[in-house]
Amino acid sequence: MFPLFGVLGGCSPAFVYMFIDALARAGVKHGMRKDQALQIATQSVLGSAKMIAESSEHPWELVDRVCSPGGTTIEGVLSLKADGLETAVQNAVDAAVEKDSKL
């Protein structure tokens, strides 16, 4: 179990950095200045992490709370699910655990 703790704690910052970068680049793609997009993406991730840390709710309950019926957020969430965000994250953890087992 210790290798898994090492992977989740040690590798996840890079995964989160990649997510923040992807959010910021999407903002730039749609016309936002890079520095502004990065600041918004970073603050959004910080606020979301704080909400999870301080809440007794499961992350999916928090997702449901911010998705308005027929709104922009649910549309984006459905796109992330269809594009395999969860699978990509799970595969990254699997690959890191596998690599750790060979070290």
Cite the ranges covered by each PLM segment.
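Anionic-ligand binding region
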Residues: 1-38
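NAD(P)-dependent Rossmann-like dehydrogenase/reductase catalytic/cofactor-binding core
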Residues: 38-103
